[in-house]
């Protein structure tokens, strides 16, 4: 018996507003990948990371917008630019017939949330950090759902419609692949990560401490970032220097330990790999939010928190040697398996799918 004519379901039309650093762009890309049925337009800022990563995947629309630092309302040019950005986004939402907006916070979220709210379009905001950013704290009240990377962020967002989902990782992170580096099979490996922007201070600390680690038998894979002025200064067969890798998962899975900044994206990757770490929060991050992130991992036993202002070359050198002494052959208890298990417990495997389902529920 015929069930009648087939009804075609229109393709959902979404706007993703994510701009700036990998911490904003990569989680949004992960959520976009989890919505293959949707027609996604992307809102960004000229000359930022999204122009390199998004343009060949999704239609990219750009606006010029700054942050909320200082008394911006008292600066007429800033206020006028913000108002202009809101109206530009309103026109985009109408033209593309957008049904819902997803944003990962930051500067771009302000005009996106304001424009969507003014048109009655629902917004899902993802806040990856333990200390929500100023935009999140100010504008989350205008969002239909606020998805959190850390439950602790909810303390700063009373009365908001919250759901803890973790921080989404791109699908390629979970796909088996080889790191392709000439590292012997059983040697201990230290992975140094400075975040998507690199970290000159960490790079210099590591290079100064590295000779003792190399002499002890440690192999080092050092992701320096592309703006490192000292690249190439340390040469050793066990020291591998890379400015950037597109997929860090194979290196995380091969490493025994990591030295890292404490951006939410990097921490999500460390948790997914179950990799113990020494975390050096970026001291100039907005409101020192990386320290809030790092404290959660340290409290869980997954990491050691080492503030940059208090860390000397000698301290870093000795801490790494002490932690890896068992892997370097000493007949002592190995602390790393317990730390690795703690890191793994912080991982949310279906984070991207949870956020995608939040968006689907609004359509």
Curated annotation (Swiss-Prot):
Topology in membrane: Peripheral membrane protein
**Could you tell me where this protein is found in the cell?**
Cell inner membrane
Quote the pathway field.
Cell wall biogenesis; peptidoglycan biosynthesis
EC number(s) per entry:
2.4.1.227
Catalyses which reaction(s)? di-trans,octa-cis-undecaprenyl diphospho-N-acetyl-alpha-D-muramoyl-L-alanyl-D-glutamyl-meso-2,6-diaminopimeloyl-D-alanyl-D-alanine + UDP-N-acetyl-alpha-D-glucosamine = di-trans,octa-cis-undecaprenyl diphospho-[N-acetyl-alpha-D-glucosaminyl-(1->4)]-N-acetyl-alpha-D-muramoyl-L-alanyl-D-glutamyl-meso-2,6-diaminopimeloyl-D-alanyl-D-alanine + UDP + H(+)
Cellular component, GO, one term:
plasma membrane
Q: What does this protein do?
A: Cell wall formation. Catalyzes the transfer of a GlcNAc subunit on undecaprenyl-pyrophosphoryl-MurNAc-pentapeptide (lipid intermediate I) to form undecaprenyl-pyrophosphoryl-MurNAc-(pentapeptide)GlcNAc (lipid intermediate II).
NCBIfam families given in the database record: murG (TIGR01133)
Q: What is this protein called?
A: UDP-N-acetylglucosamine--N-acetylmuramyl-(pentapeptide) pyrophosphoryl-undecaprenol N-acetylglucosamine transferase
Q: What gene is it encoded by?
A: murG
């Amino acid at each position: 018996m015929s069930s009648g004519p087939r009804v075609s379901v229109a393709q959902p039309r979404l706007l993703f507003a994510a701009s700036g650093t990998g911490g904003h762009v990569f989680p949004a890309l992960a959520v976009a990948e989890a919505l293959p049925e949707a027609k996604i337009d992307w809102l960004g800022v000229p000359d930022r990371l999204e122009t390199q990563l998004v343009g060949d995947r999704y239609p990219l629309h750009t606006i010029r917008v700054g942050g909320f630092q200082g008394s911006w309302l008292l600066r007429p040019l800033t206020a006028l630019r913000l108002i202009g950005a809101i109206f530009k986004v309103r026109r985009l939402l109408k033209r593309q017939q957008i049904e819902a907006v997803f944003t990962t916070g930051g500067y771009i979220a302000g005009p996106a949330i304001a424009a969507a709210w003014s048109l009655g379009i629902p917004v899902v905001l993802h806040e990856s950090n333990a200390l929500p950013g100023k935009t999140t704290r100010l504008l989350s009240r205008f969002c239909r759902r606020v998805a959190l990377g850390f439950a602790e962020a909810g303390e700063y967002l009373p009365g908001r419609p919250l759901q803890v989902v973790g921080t989404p990782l791109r699908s390629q992170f979970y796909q088996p692949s080889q790191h392709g580096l000439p590292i012997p099979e059983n040697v201990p490996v230290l992975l140094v990560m400075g975040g998507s922007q690199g970290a000159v201070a960490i790079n210099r600390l590591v290079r100064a401490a590295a000779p003792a680690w190399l002499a002890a038998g440690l192999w080092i894979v050092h992701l320096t970032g592309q703006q490192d002025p000292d690249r190439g200064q340390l040469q050793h067969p066990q020291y591998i220097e890379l400015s950037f890798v597109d997929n860090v998962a194979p290196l995380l899975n091969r490493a025994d330990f990591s030295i890292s900044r404490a951006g939410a994206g990097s921490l999500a990757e460390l948790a997914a790999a179950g990799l113990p770490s020494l975390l050096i929060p970026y001291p100039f991050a907005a409101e020192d939010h990386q320290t809030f992130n790092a404290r959660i991992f340290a409290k869980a036993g997954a990491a050691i928190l080492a503030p940059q202002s208090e860390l000397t070359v000698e301290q870093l050198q000795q801490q790494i040697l002490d932690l890896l002494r068992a892997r370097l052959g000493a007949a002592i208890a190995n602390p790393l398996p317990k730390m690795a298990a703690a890191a793994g417990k912080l991982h949310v495997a279906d984070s991207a799918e949870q956020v995608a389902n939040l968006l689907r529920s609004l359509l």
